[in-house]
């Protein structure tokens, strides 16, 4: 009976952790998630301003909560920004066309079930490992530095 109780408790704790972190798949996904003290809208406004501030093109800003209303599904605030400067992305995509799934860069700002706001994005080093493009190290370093600058400033 103790073993069963322990097992049920472990499952419930695991499900709670997944619910709180947005259902993350684990560290091998390359997704970085950082907390924000601002609302989803304000956080995304700050991320977008930061992206523009480093000369990035804004390709799209998707409001999933607004979209969900059209199909009568209620979700917590959740927005995606697609942006890029076009410096390293085309080089990487030339060598590894599937990298177009990860490039241009994306930042997701979302609210968890506890009302906490988060910013998530894919680490450039993970993209480098995923596609193993020779000679891309400087581009990947630039991607990591740029997204860290954008998100870091947005969260101040």
Feature annotation, model-predicted:
Residues 106-132:
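Beta-strand/loop substructures that line and gate deep hydrophobic ligand-binding cavities in soluble
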Residues 41-44, 48, 65, 144, ...:
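Extracytoplasmic/secreted envelope proteins and their assembly/folding machinery
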Residues 125-156:
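C-terminal partner/receptor-binding element of secreted or periplasmic proteins
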Residues 20-55:
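Terminal, regulation- and interaction-focused segments at domain boundaries
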Residues 2-7:
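Sec-dependent signal peptide recognition
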Residues 34-42, 59, 134-141:
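Soluble non-cytosolic domains of exported or imported proteins
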């Amino acid at each position: 009976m103790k073993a069963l109780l322990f097992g049920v408790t472990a499952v419930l704790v695991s499900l709670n952790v997944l619910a709180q972190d947005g259902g993350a798949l684990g560290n091998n996904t390359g997704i970085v998630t950082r907390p924000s003290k601002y609302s989803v809208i304000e956080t995304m406004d700050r991320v977008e301003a930061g992206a523009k501030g480093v000369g990035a093109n804004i390709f799209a800003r998707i409001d999933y909560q607004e979209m969900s209303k059209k199909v009568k599904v209620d979700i917590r605030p959740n927005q995606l920004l697609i942006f890029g400067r076009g410096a390293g992305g085309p080089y990487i995509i030339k060598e590894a066309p599937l990298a177009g799934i990860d490039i241009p860069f994306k930042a997701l700002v979302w609210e968890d079930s506890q009302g906490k706001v988060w910013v998530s994005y894919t680490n450039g080093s993970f993209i480098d490992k995923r596609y193993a493009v020779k000679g891309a190290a400087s581009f990947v370093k630039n991607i990591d530095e740029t997204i860290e600058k954008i998100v870091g400033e947005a969260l101040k």
